[in-house]
Regions:
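Conserved structural motif at the start of ABC-family nucleotide-binding domains
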Residues: 15, 30-32
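Q-loop/switch helix immediately C-terminal to the Walker
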Residues: 89-104, 108
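Walker B catalytic motif
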Residues: 125, 154-155
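Helix-to-loop junction immediately C-terminal to a conserved catalytic motif
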Residues: 60
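Conserved ABC ATPase signature
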Residues: 125-133
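Conserved ABC ATPase "signature" region
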Residues: 104-121
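ABC-family nucleotide-binding domains
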Residues: 153, 160
Length: 200
């Protein structure tokens, strides 16, 4: 498959995928997928089992396609996966400090936690948190990281309506300055995020 550096395109496009194919044995998962993604939200949309997560992993360089071209995807990514992968013994700021390293800024971290409705929980170890709170912390970590693009695999799973709205607003803010690739099977959030939809 082909790969290249960032590309410049109309509307600030920074990555382009052409005729991407991937199969596991005799089972085709992705067939001739093509799209461009620039600043804003690009949603990989479709029901379970159509290859959304596989495509995201290919963009991140975690899997290789069988054929096709990837241009502009060799950038610094931050991500939320389906598993949150948090340090259970640390509190919110401890998790962010560890993950972000020299990029950690406490004022920005505190502001992001406030935006996501997590301020009163910041002193508790993550092991005492609910699944929805952990999900929001994982999102905070990805959005605070210094990156060129953000990959989000079902980031709003397990959130109630109020906290889902908080999370969507934070994602929308990030998408004003960089590409956000969002995996989802729920169309309700796509209008709010003004997403360009890739149907799989």
């Amino acid at each position: 498959f082909g790969a290249g550096g960032p590309i410049d395109g109309k509307g600030g496009a920074v990555m382009e995928i052409k005729n991407l194919c991937k199969a596991y044995g005799d089972l085709p998962v992705l067939e001739n997928v093509s799209f461009t993604a620039g600043v804003g939200v690009t949603a990989l949309w479709g029901p379970s089992g159509v290859g959304k997560t596989t495509l995201l992993r290919i963009l991140l360089g975690l899997e290789k396609p069988d054929s096709g071209e990837l241009m502009g995807t060799a950038v610094r990514w931050s991500a939320v996966f389906q598993e949150d992968r948090l340090l259970e013994g640390l509190d919110a700021l401890g998790n962010l400090r560890f993950a972000l390293g020299t990029d950690y800024e406490e004022a920005k971290a505190a502001a992001m936690l406030t935006a996501l409705g997590l301020t009163w929980e910041t002193g508790k170890p993550v092991r005492e948190w609910s699944g929805g709170m952990k999900r929001r912390l994982a999102l905070a970590r990805a959005l605070l990281a210094v990156s060129d693009a953000v990959a989000l695999d079902e980031p709003f799973t397990g959130l109630d309506e109020e906290n889902r709205r908080r999370a969507e607003l934070c994602v929308a803010a990030a998408a004003e300055t960089k590409p956000v690739i969002l995996v989802t099977h729920d169309r309700t959030e796509l209008n709010l995020l003004r997403a360009n939809i890739v149907n799989l």
